[in-house]
């Protein structure tokens, strides 16, 4: 009886030692992007960007991102993907989501954010990984901003490599990699 009481007290003490932030972060999903340039592992912040994270995870789980490309890459800025095939055919996304750019997360190097049009609530499937600090994309800097919803935890060297590939224009699209950089698969890690 003494052993079980002691074990229970130790468990309660251990749980109380964890901060709420640490407990929340423990449940944040990780997503692996397997690309033709290497792997990128993302940690998504479901506490600060629940709508964007759920949206991204839904696209991942449906297989939407498989065989899409990083269709816009700009050195010293970002790499954008999640919407086009290798033939630059746009995939049909789900309806747009609410912009969560006011969540306190910043567009710093290594973060992932939702791409959108000039309409603040127009983000669908496309996302970008910042390869530099891009404070001008943050909430309130020039407009509502671009919603950060996670960060690269492994493979930032791959994102940097992708940002340096040669590009050209394809019809109305600029900064398209000359040789497609393909997201072969995207999956939520256990």
Curated annotation (Swiss-Prot):
Any GO MF annotation of the entry: peptidyl-prolyl cis-trans isomerase activity
Signal peptide start and end residues: 1-24
Record text on activity regulation: Inhibition by cyclosporin A with a Ki of 25 to 50 mu-mol, a concentration 1000-fold higher than that required for eukaryotic PPIases.
Annotated compartments: Periplasm
Pfam families reported for this sequence: Pro_isomerase
Chief location of this protein within or outside the cell: periplasm
Biological process, per Gene Ontology: protein folding
Any single Gene Ontology cellular-component annotation: periplasmic space
EC number(s) reported in the record: 5.2.1.8
Record protein name field: Peptidyl-prolyl cis-trans isomerase A
Species this chain originates from: Escherichia coli (strain K12)
Gene: ppiA
């Amino acid at each position: 009886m003494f052993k079980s009481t002691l074990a229970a007290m130790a468990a309660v003490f251990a749980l109380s030692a964890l901060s709420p932030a640490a407990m929340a972060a423990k449940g944040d999903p990780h997503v692996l992007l397997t690309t033709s340039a290497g792997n990128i592992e993302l940690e998504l912040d479901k506490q600060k960007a629940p709508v964007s994270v759920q949206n991204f995870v839904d696209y991942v789980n449906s297989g939407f991102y498989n065989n899409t490309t990083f269709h816009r890459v700009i050195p010293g800025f970002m790499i954008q993907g999640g919407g086009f095939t290798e033939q630059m055919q746009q995939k049909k996304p789900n309806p747009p989501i609410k912009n969560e750019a006011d969540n306190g997360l910043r567009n710093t190097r290594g973060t992932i954010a939702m791409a959108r049009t000039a309409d603040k609530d127009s983000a669908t499937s496309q996302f970008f990984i910042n390869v530099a600090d891009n404070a001008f994309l943050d909430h309130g800097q020039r407009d509502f901003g671009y919603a950060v919803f996670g960060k690269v935890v492994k493979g930032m060297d791959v994102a940097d490599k992708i940002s340096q590939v040669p590009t050209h224009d394809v019809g109305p699209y600029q900064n398209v990699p000359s040789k497609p950089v393909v997201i072969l698969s995207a999956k939520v890690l256990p």
